[in-house]
Amino acid sequence: MNELTSLKAAAVQFQHQASNKKYNLLIMEKFIEQAALEQVNILTFPEMCITGYWHVPKLTAAQVSALAEPIVDSPSLTLLRSLAIKHQMLIGAGLIERADDGRLYNAYVACMPDGSMHTHRKLHAFEHPAISSGDNFTVFDTPWGVKVGILICWDNNLVENARATALLGADILLAPHQTGGTDSRSPHGMKPVPLALWEERETRREEITAAFKGPSGREWLMRWLPARAHDNGVFLLFSNGVGADDDEVRTGNAMILDPYGRIVNETWAAEDAMVSAELDLSLLAMSTGRRWIHGRRPDLYQILTQPQGYERDAISARFSNVPPSR
């Protein structure tokens, strides 16, 4: 294993087309070629970017199944695997997986330079009743001497998931999303970005930039995302959709954070974009979060694994208007 002192990473935001895998893969190929020119080692695309995202809740179970692909024989992943081998790059991408037992998952696959693949199944899937939630954390070795973990979108909002991924050894967290501009049930959470604003973005540049940087976009991310990197001493690669996604507008904000929660590179452009950065791996060892983790007292934390009686399934927790009871 060739251990490096730094490596190049990149995060992509792009507007996918619903169920149009051919189009989405063409866009992804262009970014992969751009990343190869920049000698990127790790490239991350958004959640469900191959299949499309927010139209899925409106599909029938049969339509969702038809959109899904088995991981091993996936035509989409066959293409990405070949490009990962060609460019000696880790390429992460999201799709709907059809497992051997027929169950469906919101999955994110890391295609490795040697042709192998690592698959994470979203732990808190709420996109469709036909899509099951995964039951395992995902952390794996890379050719560059660092371990990579994956958490998909809402997985990152529950702090336990990020901590568990760090405890399993992750140095870099891939955090693919489809977020921003959602109609949060929380009074001071995200709110919709008008579709008309996106459609008129060329003539309303200041307004669309303000929306993407505001409380339904970047401001919302800044309330919690840097803490996932800082508190766990990991680099974090945030990739996201951008633009109209059915009846919502994704706010992009692709960014890369270091183990201190500092933003190394980001964009708030209202367009398809890629941000890249050199990750200084020497920052990991003495980062604040890693030092704090060594002060843990696991004997006190049994409460974290004990059901409290008010837990809900992901769909209910995400969409219910009934206030949580405690």
Where are these regions (language model features)?
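CN hydrolase (nitrilase-like) catalytic-core segments centered on the catalytic cysteine
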Residues: 72-92, 147, 156-274
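Active-site beta-strand/loop signature of hydrolases that rely on acidic residues for catalysis
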Residues: 9, 24, 35-62, 84, ...
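Beta-strand-turn-beta hairpins that frame and shape the catalytic cleft
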Residues: 2-9, 139-149, 170-172
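Short, glycine-anchored, charge-dense loop/turn motifs used at functional sites
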Residues: 106, 110-117, 257-265
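A short, polar/charged loop-to-alpha-helix boundary motif
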Residues: 122-136, 271-289
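N-terminal glycine-/serine-/threonine-rich phosphate-binding loop
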Residues: 1-42
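Cysteine/selenocysteine-centered motifs that mediate thiol-based redox chemistry or coordinate metal-sulfur cofactors
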Residues: 149-171, 175-177, 284-326
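Short beta-strand scaffold segments in enzyme catalytic cores
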Residues: 93-95, 106-110, 138, 254-256, ...
